[in-house]
Every structure is written in structure tokens, then in C-alpha cells.
Amino acid sequence: MTDHDERTFVMVKPDGVQRGLIGDIVTRLETKGLKMVGGKFMRIDEELAHEHYAEHEDKPFFDGLVSFITSGPVFAMVWEGADATRQVRQLMGATDAQDAAPGTIRGDYGNDLGHNLIHGSDHEDEGANEREIALFFDDDELVDWDRDASAWVYEDLADHD
């Protein structure tokens, strides 16, 4: 990982898994120039769901969130790249799929607010990436590796410091 890279947590939710969209979503993230450093196909139990959505615990939709995220398998991932969190959020599109722009994951594949296919760490919450990554992955499950194409995707950011 370079000084300019960051890691971000991304999850294909049960609706995206059931609709067979894991490959399409991974392809979009890779095509953007991001690099997967961890991936796990798994089921989320209620305890993990409560931890993951703890900030929504007092909201009226909390029980529905927990019920949905535990309803089927998910594909949890960690991605790395320059400004990775912001890039993922842009690719995802608006939270409500009906408001998401065409060309975004939710705009192209999503149906509504409750079935919006994908979760990504909040770019406005500085601790969200580390917290979510640690919740779903042990350090030894993340792989440091160099992609030979990085020089073809990003200009040398060191020249701009």
C-alpha cells in the first residue's frame, strides 16, 4: 500500500448475491483501478448485524436492517486505492436506488431503498473504514500485493505532494 492509498470496506448485500451481481460489482471496482485485498463469502449472524449497524439502533428501520442483512449470504470485501472510499461511494450511487444516477451500481441494478445491493464505508466518518474492516476481517485475511498495472491507472501521486 502506498502513502496515497487507503483501504475501504464494501459488502454485496443479500439481494445482490441472490441476483448474481457479485461478479459485475467486483468488475466495476477493478475497472475503476481499485484493488481487492480481502474477500469473504459469508452469512452475518444477528450479533454481527447489531455491531455493524449499531449507529442505527435507535432508528425505526433498525429491525428491518438486521432482518435483511441476516436473510442470506453476503460478500464482504476490502478494497485499496487512492481515495478508495470516495471512489466506491461514487460508483455505488445514491442510497435510495430510485435516486441513483444511471451508470452507478444502484442506478443500474437497484430497485429501492431497502434493496440497494451494496454497502460501502462512509467517507465522512473517518473511523468507519477501520471499524468495519476490523469487524469483518482479521489482519491475516488481508493480502498486501502489488498490481503491475497501478502505474497505468494512477499518475505518480508523489510528484504532487
From Swiss-Prot:
The keyword Zinc does not apply. Its cofactor is Mg(2+). ATP binds at K13, F61, R89, T95, R106, N116. InterPro entries: NDK-like_dom, NDK-like_dom_sf, Nucleoside_diP_kinase. GO terms for biological process: CTP biosynthetic process; GTP biosynthetic process; UTP biosynthetic process. It holds the Pfam family NDK. GO terms for molecular function: ATP binding; metal ion binding; nucleoside diphosphate kinase activity. SUPFAM superfamilies: Nucleoside diphosphate kinase, NDK. Keywords: ATP-binding, Cytoplasm, Kinase, Magnesium, Metal-binding, Nucleotide metabolism, Nucleotide-binding, Phosphoprotein, Transferase. It catalyses: a 2'-deoxyribonucleoside 5'-diphosphate + ATP = a 2'-deoxyribonucleoside 5'-triphosphate + ADP; a ribonucleoside 5'-diphosphate + ATP = a ribonucleoside 5'-triphosphate + ADP. The active site is at H119 (pros-phosphohistidine intermediate). It is an enzyme of class 2 (transferase). Its main location: cytoplasm. It is found in: Cytoplasm. GO terms for cellular component: cytoplasm. Its EC number is 2.7.4.6. It comes from the Archaea. Belongs to the NDK family. Major role in the synthesis of nucleoside triphosphates other than ATP. The ATP gamma phosphate is transferred to the NDP beta phosphate via a ping-pong mechanism, using a phosphorylated active-site intermediate. This is Nucleoside diphosphate kinase. The gene is ndk.
